Amino acid sequence: MDHGAPSTPAKHHVGVHSSDEGFLAVMVPFLREGIAAEDEPDPAAVTTSRKLDLLRDALGPDARHVDFLDSARWYRGTPANSMATALDYYVAHASPEGRLHLAGEPVWPGRSPRQISEWKRYEALATELFTGAPPDLMCLYDTRTAPPDVIDAARHTHPTELHRHGIRPSPLYTEPAVYATQDLGPLPAPPRDAIGIGLDGDLTAGHRFAADQAQARGMAPDAAARFGRAVSGATGYAASQGCDRAYLKLWSTRERVICELRTPRGRITDPFLGFRPPGPGTRPEDGLWDTRQVCEFVDMRSGDEAKEGWTIRMETALVPAG
């Protein structure tokens, strides 16, 4: 995936439909195009079990050339978890040249407004990560199950829309970095009873602080250790940016543990930090990949020209011991 070609958007289509017939009208031609593509592996369809059955019936004998996958398993966890699933699948199944037809329908029912907001940004991220790469990706949106604001967001995060008459550019498409950072207000202040420490010199000391505090609040030891490693991904990134001082604050509710890292200087300019998987080399932000895999929410904020410094706030479920 070429991050140096932002002017060439990925083939990342949105397929909006409002009926089973509309679903098949966009999916069947897309999958048959993948089946017919020379030197390309079988296409994949990720959706509900009911819609997978519809596809099998509509494709007939061609169904044997499609990899059918249940969306409940593909899209479980956080957006970062699903991105890891998609990237792992792509690496394992794409042709040597990177070609693959892959269509998926995200799961919207049961998600909170905050989770939905994160999933909207996930779609912008997919366009960013696959920019310059050769796969054909399509995301399905059913107006019967996806809220109207989600449908609207989809048209902002996908460069093209695939419908029964072909592919057309999306007039609402917004550059991924712009979409991912719009409407980000300031984070709420930590509660007054938050526990804080200053980190000077060895910023990685935050790992033990976070793990101990999480366990003291009732989190199971193995979960607390994972959370400590997630926090070390953020402190390690701070150290790589030349920060010799930082501050950690940690607090909890009955169901959540939250840890915040603040630095007195520097800025975060990349809205996709931690979403790109580690590659063959080592990058300063690689530890943030693990941070996002462990934490349900990872919020990043940066100061402006008048106020330097940045914040990474990490939040996860309080998994109780026993």
Q: What annotation goes with each model-predicted range?
A:
Residues 199, 203, 227, 284-287:
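The cytosolic transmitter module of two-component sensor histidine kinases
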Residues 185, 236-322:
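Conserved beta-strand-loop-beta-strand hairpin that lines the nucleotide-binding pocket
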Residues 27, 122, 231, 284-287:
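Amphipathic coiled-coil/heptad-repeat helices and related helical stalk/stem segments
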Residues 204-235, 239:
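Conserved short strand/loop->alpha-helix "switch" segment adjacent to the catalytic nucleotide/phosphoryl-transfer site
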Residues 1-188:
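Positively charged, polar, low-complexity stretches
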Residues 16, 190-199:
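Short amphipathic
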